[in-house]
């Protein structure tokens, strides 16, 4: 009786590993490009240094040249549409990659995936049959 429970456990482990192996991975994310290039700092005009003998009058205020700082805000993320089930929509603006999909039925990758899954299925059935006999 214990050998049958081991066989059932191995069968369930095989099914679980097959499900994990065929689960789709996370979709790649694309960071948006900035709308405007970052502004370069303009060269500052250097004021002539005063001579040590000439002191400015105490009533004259000293001002520092203005410093331009780059904007700190990042561009807003593009809106994404979602279907009622919560899956990403397929309305993708032109020029951007669409959501990751499983291989189409006509692609050569689909045939390779199908062959791998068939080989795995037959190997699992053979192992289970050998353990039961």
From Swiss-Prot:
Keywords attached to this entry? Cell membrane, Glycoprotein, GPI-anchor, Lipoprotein, Membrane, Proteoglycan, Pyrrolidone carboxylic acid, Signal
Q: Where in the cell is it found?
A: Cell membrane
According to its UniProt record, how is this protein modified after translation?
Answer: O-glycosylated on the hydroxyproline residues.
Q: What membrane topology was assigned to this protein in its record?
A: Lipid-anchor; GPI-anchor
* Residue span(s) of the pro-peptide: 110-133
Q: Where is the lipid attached (GPI-anchor amidated asparagine)?
A: 109
- Residues spanning the signal sequence: 1-21
Q: Give positions of region: Disordered.
A: 23-110
Q: Point to the regions of Pro residues compositional bias.
A: 25-37, 49-81
Q: Which domain of life is it from?
A: Eukaryota
Positions carrying Pyrrolidone carboxylic acid are 22
A cellular component term from Gene Ontology for this protein is: plasma membrane
Which family does the record claim for this protein?
A: Belongs to the classical AGP family.
What is the protein named? Classical arabinogalactan protein 5
Q: Organism, per UniProt? A: Arabidopsis thaliana (Mouse-ear cress)
Name the gene for this chain: AGP5
